[in-house]
Amino acid sequence: MRLEEDVKLDYKDVLIRPKRSTLKSRSQVSLERRTKFRNYEPPFSHNVEDYHYNGVPIMASNMDGVGTMEMADKLAEGKIFTCLVKTYTAEQLIQYFDSDMPERTDNVAMSIGTSDEDWCKLEIVHQIVTEKLKYVCMDIANGYSDHFAAHVRK
């Protein structure tokens, strides 16, 4: 274990100052944001701009009862992102993503762990639905482990 002794900032050390608004009404507010992933280049020969996230920066977790396909479809209507639970089979995921619903591609992630079975499931799903699966959630208890870093490099 490595001990870090340098000074860390906390929430009490941060001051958030609102900027002046140019909006005349709250009805003009848009929650949508565009996020560019710095180290990402799409594997296909499509427009790079299409592979940045554009939606509401709220994410429904991949917990049981939350990260369901039904919930994902409902939240995708409002451009809210969902990470599906890991318990879906490859067949269920293929059937879900291999549809004519671009909201699923743009607002839903398949979840995997770091087991070999999860990696095989990802390869099977991706091989069939290809570019319709745009996001993958890697669910692991400790994101600082060497095991996680090695799995990301895969």
Regions found by a protein language model. Give the residues of each.
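Active-site entrance/lid segments in N-terminal catalytic domains of soluble metabolic enzymes
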Residues: M1-K154
